[in-house]
Amino acid sequence: MNSLFMIFSLGIVGASLMVISTPNPVYSVFWLVIAFVNAAVMFISLGLDYIGLIFIIVYVGAIAILFLFVIMLIQQPNKIDSQDHSHFLPIGLSVIFLFYSLLTNSPKYISNPVIGSRTNIGAIGSHLYTTYYELVLIASLVLLVAMIGAILLAKQPNSPFLYNSHGESLRSRQDLFLQISREHL
């Protein structure tokens, strides 16, 4: 168990170093996803199933993909960073030393029987769907309304509906008047 923890911890550190050292932002997001997946697998191997799955859903499925969409929408040309960042090395080494000293001086085993008995994802799911089922339904309705609102906000105001009353697609038809009037301009 300790060796798995060390392997995934080193994977997180290596992927995090690649995030900040890769010049291409798309590859940087890729390494960020790998760091998040390593953290999720580390949590799952420690018996914290719920936190590991939340890491995958929230961080990999939402935040990293949002970063990727923003990077692809901005479409900045590749810039080569010619600045020397070696003056940050002493600060980075001192932060690493501080974290290492805090970790080595912390108590090795911290146990809480209440937390230890509720780490199973099945217990959390059964508690959500039996005791708090009304809140789950309300949350799903709020998310549905938010999704419909996002679709309506993203729709352009002057664009026609996708289909007419006969079920034919309106986007595949061409506007003959616009084509004729463009030829004479």
Curated annotation (Swiss-Prot):
GO CC field: mitochondrial membrane
Swiss-Prot/TrEMBL catalytic activity: a ubiquinone + NADH + 5 H(+)(in) = a ubiquinol + NAD(+) + 4 H(+)(out)
Family: Belongs to the complex I subunit 6 family.
Enzymatic class: translocase
Bilayer-crossing regions: 3-23, 28-48, 54-74, 87-107, 134-154
MF terms (GO), sorted A to Z: NADH dehydrogenase (ubiquinone) activity
Main location: mitochondrion
Membrane-topology annotation of the record: Multi-pass membrane protein
Location in the cell: Mitochondrion membrane
Species in which this protein is naturally found: Sarcophyton glaucum (Toadstool umbrella leather coral)
Xref: InterPro entries: NADH_UbQ/plastoQ_OxRdtase_su6 (IPR001457), Nuo/plastoQ_OxRdtase_6_NuoJ (IPR042106)
Keywords for the protein's UniProt record, in alphabetical order: Electron transport, Membrane, Mitochondrion, NAD, Respiratory chain, Translocase, Transmembrane, Transmembrane helix, Transport, Ubiquinone
Enzyme Commission code: 7.1.1.2
Protein name: NADH-ubiquinone oxidoreductase chain 6
Annotated function: Core subunit of the mitochondrial membrane respiratory chain NADH dehydrogenase (Complex I) that is believed to belong to the minimal assembly required for catalysis. Complex I functions in the transfer of electrons from NADH to the respiratory chain. The immediate electron acceptor for the enzyme is believed to be ubiquinone.
Pfam families: Oxidored_q3
